[in-house]
Amino acid sequence: GQHNFISDPRRYDSVVYSVTGKRPVVWGSDFSFNALGGNIADYHHCGPMNLTSPWGECRINGLSTETLRQNLVDEIKQRHAEGRIITLMWHCCFPSECNDCDGASIWTWQNRPSNEVWKELTTEGTRLNTQWKKQMDTVIPYLEQLRDAGIPILWRPYHEMNGVWFWWCNKPGENGFKKLWIMTYNYFTKVHKLNNLLWVWNTNAPRDKKGD
């Protein structure tokens, strides 16, 4: 039930039901991003919010960020009323691009932020740190709605941070990913009082064992 796409929030539930006759207890989705550029089809599989479901032709769906995220909140309220456990993630652009970027801004194999850029991001009051807060502020109102509705969320931001593919990956040490994680926790929990979030440290794990 995890990672139903924000533009097609019932697709995977329907697939599971068609095979098993049962609905997953865990229901999940993604705050996502708007894919830009000439290679949007390369990122269709992860469900950019401005694209149609990856099960069909890759097309722009014409819906706004605000509409899609509000629809997500409404869907979550329905699923929670059914007794489902809700989990949310976020494939987010680099903060300077907010919600609209080429997918290569997220899947940055070769051009992850330099140590200097990372330091600016995680230093209070810098230009990039301010842009990061503005980016966070684009999803916080929707999480506040869920808090006010009494809905707990398994919140797993910056997933697979021990990999090498996302812009937030492969930043060890006290001033690396750990600092970004604590900064995010403090901003959501202490500044915005989002006490309905259960924070999930979502590492990557190999799919198989060598030689198995």
Where do the language-model regions lie?
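Boundary/entry segment of secreted carbohydrate-active catalytic domains
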Residues: 1-33
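Substrate-binding cleft of extracellular glycoside hydrolase catalytic domains
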Residues: 32, 36-194
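Hydrophobic faces of well-ordered beta-strands that scaffold small-molecule active sites
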Residues: 1, 25-29, 86-88, 153-157, ...
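Surface-exposed substrate-engagement region within the catalytic domains
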Residues: 9, 13-18, 185-212
